């Protein structure tokens, strides 16, 4: 699944296996997880699933914390994410604005929480917040019920089948929107917590690297924007 994440974040390649002295080291680690997966399948309403796994809904393992905030309560410099800041088919959210000048209520979110664009969900705008901030009410903030479910929740709501499901259930013709109540009904195969814990351990590490790269890139861009005009004007000179 980490390979799938790498495919939707091409600017931040993620190796499905850790790279040490050679690939064999990563393969050896993958075998360490073999015991987490049963060797038999059973029938279910969603088809065959691993024995011991269950069928559930997104709402069983995730929540939408409705932390509303009024314009007067927002610090002008607090990061603000709108739909236009969210790229399509990428969980890396490298762009945001500021709350200064906002005139309507927004939702608060925390760094590491998942943001899902509910307006025209077929645009496939899903990402992980790289900062604390506020967002448009056309964005659903999603959190796992416990940290162990983070990778599993992120993997599902950033997937094509989930986006197709929300699009099919959207209300409205010109401006179709989905809702958390619709999202929460999404049926899925639910593994035991020991599986999701192992998966989240690797997924969270990959996401943390993406977020660190975002902040590094923004810092370098700010440095460039500060120094370039001075270099062009001759205020600064580069020793030859």
Label for each model-derived stretch:
Residues 1-11, 147, 152, 159, ...:
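Amphipathic alpha-helical coiled-coil/heptad-repeat segments
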Residues 9, 13, 66-73, 165:
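Proline-centered turn/helix-capping motifs that create local helix->coil transitions or kinks
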Residues 16-19, 25-27, 32-69, 193-197, ...:
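Non-catalytic DNA-recognition/assembly elements of restriction-modification systems
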Residues 39-44, 59-70, 76-111, 122, ...:
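Sequence-specific dsDNA recognition surfaces
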Residues 45, 49, 174, 186-187:
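Residues marking the start of alpha-helices
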Residues 82, 141-143, 187:
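Short, well-ordered beta-strand micro-motif
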Residues 105-107, 111-183:
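A short beta-sheet element
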């Amino acid at each position: 699944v980490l390979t799938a994440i790498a495919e939707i974040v091409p600017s931040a390649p993620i190796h499905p296996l850790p790279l040490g002295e050679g690939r064999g080291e990563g393969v050896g680690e993958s075998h360490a997880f073999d015991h987490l997966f049963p060797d038999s399948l059973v029938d279910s309403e969603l088809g065959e699933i691993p024995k011991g796994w269950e069928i559930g809904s997104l709402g069983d393992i995730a929540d939408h914390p409705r932390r509303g905030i009024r314009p007067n309560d927002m610090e002008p410099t607090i990061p603000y994410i709108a739909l236009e800041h969210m790229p399509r088919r990428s969980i890396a959210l490298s762009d945001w604005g500021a709350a200064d000048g906002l005139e309507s209520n927004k939702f608060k979110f925390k760094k590491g929480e998942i943001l899902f664009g509910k307006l025209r969900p077929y645009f496939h705008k899903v990402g992980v917040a790289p900062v604390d901030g506020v967002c448009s009410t056309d964005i659903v903030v999603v959190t796992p019920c416990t940290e162990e479910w983070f990778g599993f929740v992120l993997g599902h709501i950033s997937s094509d089948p989930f986006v197709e499901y929300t699009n099919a259930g959207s209300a409205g013709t010109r401006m179709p929107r989905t809702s958390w109540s619709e999202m929460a009904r999404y049926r899925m195969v639910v593994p035991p917590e020991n599986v999701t814990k192992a998966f989240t351990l690797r997924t969270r590490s990959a996401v943390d690297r993406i977020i660190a790269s975002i902040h590094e890139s923004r810092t370098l861009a700010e440095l460039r924007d500060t120094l370039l005009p001075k270099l062009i004007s001759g205020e600064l000179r580069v020793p030859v």
